[in-house]
Amino acid sequence: MHSVYTKYTIILILLVIYQGLPTNTQVASRIFGVGSKSSGPLYRQLIDIYSYTYDNAVFIFEDLPIDVILTQVDYIDYVGLDRCISHEYEEIFNLVQFPLAGQAIVMTYNIPELANLDTRIVIDRQTLGKIWTGEISKWNHPDIIALNPTLNGTLPDKEIKLGYNDDGNVSISGIVQAALSSFYGNFATEFNNAGQLFANMSFANESRCVNIGPSSRERFDWVKNTTYSLTFVNYADVFNNTNPNISVMNMYNKAGNLVEPSLESVQFAMADFKDEYSNNNFALDVFDAPGNNSWPLSYVNYIVMSKRFFQLDCSRADVVLKFIAWVYTNTAASKALTQNQFYPLDNTLKKVSIDNIYIVKCNNVSVSEQQYLISFGGSTSIVPSWLTAFTSGSIVAKYYSTLSSNSIELLTTHGCDFAVTINGVDQKFYQEIEDLAVMPLAAFSIVPAYNIPEIVGKTLVLDIDVIVKIYLGEITNWNDTKIRNLNPEISNYLPNAIINVVVQNIESDINQIFTKFLSQESEIFSQEIGQTYNPDLSLFNSSVIFVDDIDGLGDELIDNKYSFGFWTDFGVRLLSRVQTVQMASLKINDDIIEPNYDTLKNAISSESNQIARSTNSNVWPITSMISIVYPETTMKNKDKAVAIAEFMYWTQYDPLAINSANNKGYYLASSDPQLRSVVLDLLKNFKFEDESVSSYANCIYQGSICSNFGTCIESACICNSSRTGTYCEKIITDSENNTLIIILATVIPIACIFGLLLLTLLIVIIFLLKHRNTTNNDWEIDFSELEIGETLGTGGYGEVYKSIWKGTEVAVKLISSKHVSKDMERSFFEEVKIMTSLRHPNVVLFMAASTKSPNMCIVMEFMSLGSLYDLLGNELIPEIPYALKIKMAYQASKGMHFLHSSGIVHRDLKSLNLLLDSKWNVKVSDFGLTKVKSELDKKKTNDNIIGTIHWIAPEILNDSTEVDYILADVYSFGIILWELLTREQPYKGMTPAAIAVSVIRDGMRPPISDEAVTAHSIEYIDLIKQCWHSDTIIRPTFLEIMTRLSNILGDSSNMTSGTSSSSLSSGGIGKSITDSKSSNSRSSVESSNTSNTFRGIDRHNSHPTGEVTVAFIDIISASKLWEYDPDGMCESTKMYNEIIRRVTKKYGGYESFISKDRNSGEGSFCLVFSDAIQAINSCEEMQLQLLNANWPKKILQHPAAAEEFDRTDQLIFRGLRVRMALHCGSVKISQDPMTRKYQYSGSTVNITGKITTLTHGGQIIVSENLYQKVNNDFTFITVGKIDIPDYPSKMTLYEIKFEILKNRFFGGITYVNYNDDTDSGTADDSNYDSGKIIDIDYMADIDKEDSFLTSANMCRWIINYDEISIGKQIGLGSYGIVFNGKWKGVDVAVKKFVKQKLSETQLLEFRAEMAFLSELKHSNIVTFIGACIKKPNICIVTEYMRMGNLRDVLKNPDIKITFANKLKLLYGAAMGIDYLHSSNPMIVHRDIKPANILVDEHFNVKIADFGFARIKEDNTTMTRCGTPCWTAPEVIRGEKYCEKADVFSFGVVMWEVLTGKEPFAECNFMKVSLDILEGGRPIIPSDCPHEFAKLIKKCWHAKAHKRPTMTEVVQQLMLITEQFDHKV
């Protein structure tokens, strides 16, 4: 019966697939899949990780019992099965199945007696079969004791409680049943007799046996709760078990060996069947595999889908195939699977599996157009780097390191597309593959490497004899006489230290190469050790360090002082500490040979020309050639053959490939004439079905391209002028020239006639084009074509505006044109011409430009999510998944690699210049225009001549003469990687000068905490440190950065996915995986545009939908409190915000996102709840917590926050008065693309807001709608009826009365109580109908300011930006741009901050400081009028000073200032600074300089730009900063400082006013900083009055405590003025 059921089940499943796929897809690909409950966690994990890669689809997966899968007919794109289907069913239903991942089934038991024993029960196949037939029913059965003698007496005399399940043949239950049948003949017989059902077997009738759930997780839960139980589960479910009673059995396999479940044992089981797999037979099980190391209960999960179907749109199937290929090729997928005990296919099976992708056809055309190249080969750094760089949208290449001979073996069985060898090819392979071809690619040296700290930077010389004796243990110390004799110049430095020999303790090509070399050179070595892949040195040497990692020998050399071993030249170069591990020279025949490029080149040249090495004394003796091995004429797939040929040519001739090889120390085959001919001839002979596959084949002739006298274009030679012929092989002779003359004499007259006609036509066309206002430069536009919108940002060279061009949103960067010359216009034109030709997915697209002053601008694509800097600092995004961080870093490095490959260096790389589009793709911006920027810098003063210090490399800060700007960009990228790691600002709290000095002098870098190291991979931390290393040689290129980031979290083409559990501890994928495992319902992973990017973020954003309850929370009289006590109100608002959010979270509410034109945390909240009762309960608790909060004392002294008691002395009011209103209904929901926060809008929200404006502080009002839902749960008092917009009739409002706050009374309203004689109660419908509710003027007793929400914005110093008429730009500072303007008819100066995205805390502190500054009044400080607080127009408004700043006045040749007037100017400035220092609290200016001392038309001076220290610091991070000419040394050192820092600055200002010159003119940033630290000061003129000079010196004294106070400076200036007047 069961066999019939099983067959019927399989057929129905196949019908599901067969019927489900051939349906028309929707506009967006929606991928539906189902699978067994046991495979559910596997698919959820893969989908979660993959969704980071493919963002144009929606993956929906359900894990179901096998029979329930049948109900999903209309949806299925694929089915996930625990077991293969037969070849018969494949053919009948036109299906293809892909093995996805292996798993181990384990027998899991619960035995309390074994809880404290570190051992597992061991079982063999037959004994396990007996347990499942019932022949063995007790744990202490003799057969079990025999296999576990150490547990004799411990195993209990208890019945084995068996948990079984019959879920069908293609489930995990079916696999166990089949495996047991294979293990034990009696089980097979009884099982078949029972209709192939556990339930019908004899043991199932016993009370100890239970039929439990179909999923592995259900069975595991049963075991946990049942002592002495046994069942079968996936190892993935039990792997992390912490219950000491629970364990799993180890087993003897078919080969009789004891094995345990693991990645290796399952992969061994899969590999046992690789011959069948290679023959394209996937319809097989892997349990009870015959191999020595195979786990007997292994199985493979399969994806099954149709391979022939017809659809209008085939994209959905393409997505499924891309997903499958990604599982095979993505490193991150493999890592994540392994960590959760799902085992990726053995690498040798992946190529065979992936080739099945091409048999899936839609409309008789192969669905997949992408080529996947799978290759194996020797361990080498260049091939993976090449493949990473070569990978494109149509080609994905994957390389696996193994022995060279193993890779060629795989090629013979079609286990890879091509092999790579680094030690040649054994002759046997030429017999197995008759057309085997071997193409040389690049050579490298193998070198004796050592770690001897005492001789770092010096050269060590060894010879063969010494090296052999080191390996044989005859020389054990570095100061051995033989080594000293070879190194007389450094013999005194050689340490008395034991030589630690490092060798690979595994089979490796490097072992084979160096032992072969030593065996050839030394008969003793040949006899004792000989040529071998794994030398055993333990017999000869007691100081050996064995390495099990094929790439790990270099790491051991680094970690162990006085170590030695043969390693690759490129391996030494890749080590992070190159100075520590060095390469020894070799003495051969009295010649000392260094391991370098020249000796490698000579070695390869000698070999290729068959010259004996002995004839050339400068030849490195031990080298290896990397060669690609492939079938020359019998490739099975033409497209793959074409891709491989393209890769071959690319490695030899592409500049990117050449640079990569050269940087890593390789010698390219194409660099040698003989080898170049070999390469090209092999490329020409590479064929598929007798047709050459290389696009260059038709140009290759006698080992050259176009005989070296032409260029190959579109598979044909274009010859130089002196050559002709198909291959440019013929030289043009004189006779040919004569013939040519005759032909030309005939043709030219005819051609001239046609030429005249064409010229006329051309003139007409040019005329028409000219009148159509077009140019040859299609990127050139007229500025009038742009609709300029809001400001997006400001930089050192102009402003960026959001604009519209041709109906498209764009970003327009308007170049500052104040100093633009004609030469700059020309440079701008030429540079923009280059920039617009650049196209890369990770570089911001230059779309157009206007190149004429005064409107020079660049039009770029609009990046809607802003900068990476903004993202990392956005407090509304609580977590960013680690995988997403790596993805963003990878994309940025890819963009930078493209720029560097295009000959462009950035010079200002920082997180602010990495922008994100709507799909969260990172793109590099603000590069290029080097000449224009340089010219603009020359026009500026030394107050603004350097970029953002935080990201600048030390060699640039130090003004080094030879700067490699490519590596300087890498340094900047290191800081960006740190920002991604920590989400903090680099060097927070430090001034630019302090940063620069610390970076150069002290080698300071941003700190990496232990927590960060723990939470992220060590590879990522190492990459950061290498990028920002002070030694530029250590810094990697961006190509290497790409490769390393790719290795951290997957391939560059599929940059996605998970990492270790520790790496994900901060959230993201790891949590998503955990969550999905516990879910048995539908898992939907939406990959459209943005949602996938936030798998780790969205889980925090559970939001109410449908009909909801909206609550508005608002502080009344906030403006009065802000004006009364700004600091107290700042702290109170923070406290209030924290209380509201904490209680909201407790009751399941959601804080609606604030629209872009409003700021959060200003006093009003819009909260949304799914449950109305919870909403009201939260309001009650908020009121109680607000009543008992620890408010600032001064705030409580104001009537709007004072304590109030009722008649019984019960406290009813204290602190902020907060009103609350609630209403329910449907809402509109939108989502912010960056924060993923939801914003609620619509009439329900509007009505709630209106009700709130009618509510008193401390009162809670609900709408009629909400009242009708909850009137039986709370006590209400009816307030009255009011007219509400968006509501069809008058609405009745109700006040909620809570017992503890029932005596709160709100004047001005007549309450109608419907509980007769009681003081409180619940209104009911009968009373409502009685007509007692009265209309009221509810506003009668509410202050005018409280008739609006967020009354904090009604403070007198908060200005509406729309009321300001902005004029021209009049200044540009380190943190903002200054415009003149008019406000209410008054001339004002408007300083707009560069950083418009302030955090909630920053905005509150900004408000407090505004309130404080608005109270300052002095004739020598600029009057603060107010501020605008809504982005994108956050700014401060001050009085306008017509004469500009003191610097402008000093530089104006038309203004002659006498010394007396200079004293007057300085006296006024000193008075202003002294006033700031005397205020309470004291204001330290921090930036005293002439640019911040303004002058009016009457020559009165006023200090400007004081206050807002925190915002200035944040804005300075975003902008280019000036030199520290006026900065005190303690500030430069990064020490704590006081108001005396302003005194120092004023001393420099005094000198500047005295001389009219700029301090430290022509000095760069670093020189100024160091000069100030070392006591350097501007030279005081000899004719300076003595007392004045004395005061200057006192002011700029190096020690702060020896400087005068500003009060003393004022007094001294007054005395000097009096003395001068007296003399005059």
UniProtKB/Swiss-Prot annotation:
The keyword Membrane applies. It is a single-pass type I membrane protein. Glycans are attached at residues 152, 169, 200, 205, 225, 240, 245, 292, 364, 479, 541, 720, 737. Keywords: ATP-binding, Glycoprotein, Kinase, Membrane, Nucleotide-binding, Receptor, Repeat, Serine/threonine-protein kinase, Signal, Transferase, Transmembrane, Transmembrane helix. The active site is at 908 (proton acceptor), 1487 (proton acceptor). CDD domains: CHD (cd07302), STKc_MAP3K-like (cd13999). It comes from the Viruses. Its main location: membrane. One of its GO terms (biological process) is cyclic nucleotide biosynthetic process. This is Putative serine/threonine-protein kinase/receptor R831. The lineage of its organism: Viruses, Varidnaviria, Bamfordvirae, Nucleocytoviricota, Megaviricetes.
